[in-house]
Swiss-Prot record:
GO terms for cellular component: cytosol. NCBIfam families: PRK02101.1-1 (NF002541), PRK02101.1-3 (NF002542). InterPro entries: YaaA. It comes from Pseudomonas aeruginosa (strain ATCC 15692 / DSM 22644 / CIP 104116 / JCM 14847 / LMG 12228 / 1C / PRS 101 / PAO1). This is UPF0246 protein PA3539. Belongs to the UPF0246 family. GO terms for biological process: response to hydroperoxide. Pfam families: H2O2_YaaD. It comes from the Bacteria.
């Protein structure tokens, strides 16, 4: 079983990594093509394109200028440890052991507007480029056109390498939109996490993002390979709802937050 999650806007390059193992991103030639285009934008153009403050636009213009494809532990960090946000709070990889990282490296992928697909231990230099950014490029009008079917092909290769055909979607719609389902040679299992609010179960963004990270953590820590075991997920008060679920749509409910 292979999982996909979204990246995060918030990055942490200050905290020392808890593992010294690392790998190199597999698709840097594509990332470099995007970087070369981003370098042509002024901070004002970046601000308008990405709807960023002047300060953040300036920061990312500097990031694009200093980005170069020779990644080392001195100028980059493992992607799973560099991303910070609700999903990664739930995943909490900071307390992983080496065996956890090894399993994650085989069974987890992070989708990225710049890097396409990242493995957990892939070194990553800091950036800001959300998948939904309408960055016109040589391949089309936006990043979905830029990546085309490549991300699906790379996920197929990862699945083939582990001899499996199940893809667990823990990514947002924005990011999973870059995955062409028809090109996948896999059964896709979607997930929903709902919390009780005002008498109804609803998807609350903050909690749902964190729950997606907790589900990824559960799969990694339990070394889960059979999707049937996903129904046993019960972290922080969530429980499987057979009534609201379908064969490839797993719904988890929670009656009260526990965090």
């Amino acid at each position: 079983m292979l999982m996909v999650i979204s990246p995060a806007k918030t990055l942490d390059y200050e905290t020392p990594p808890v593992t010294h193992r690392f790998t190199q991103p597999q698709y840097l030639d594509h990332a470099q093509e995007l970087i070369q285009q981003l370098r042509q934008l002024t901070p004002l153009q970046i601000s308008e394109l990405m709807k960023l403050s002047d300060k953040l636009a300036g920061l990312n213009a500097a990031r694009y200028a200093s980005w170069h494809p020779e990644f080392t532990p001195e100028n980059a960090k493992q992607a799973l440890l560099a991303f910070k946000g609700d999903v990664y709070t739930g995943l909490n990889a900071e307390d992983f052991g080496e065996d956890d990282f090894a399993f994650a490296q085989d069974h987890l992928r992070m989708l990225s507007g710049l890097y396409g697909v990242l493995r957990p231990l892939d070194l990553m230099q800091p950036y800001r480029l959300e998948m939904g950014t309408r960055l016109a490029n040589a391949r089309g009008k936006d990043l979905y056109a830029f990546w085309g079917e490549r991300i699906s092909q790379w996920l197929n290769e990862a699945l083939a390498a582990q001899g499996d055909d199940v893809l667990l979607n823990l990514a947002s719609n924005e990011y999973f939109g870059a995955v062409k389902r028809k090109a996948l040679q896999a059964r896709v299992i979607d997930t929903e996490f709902k919390d009780l609010k005002n008498g109804q179960y609803k998807i609350i963004s903050f909690y749902a993002k964190k729950a997606r990270g907790m589900m990824a953590r559960y799969v990694i820590r339990e070394r889960l390979r059979d999707p049937a075991g996903l129904k046993d997920f019960n972290a922080h008060g969530y429980y499987f709802s057979a009534e609201q679920s379908g064969p490839d749509q797993l719904v988890f409910l929670r009656d009260a937050p526990q965090d």
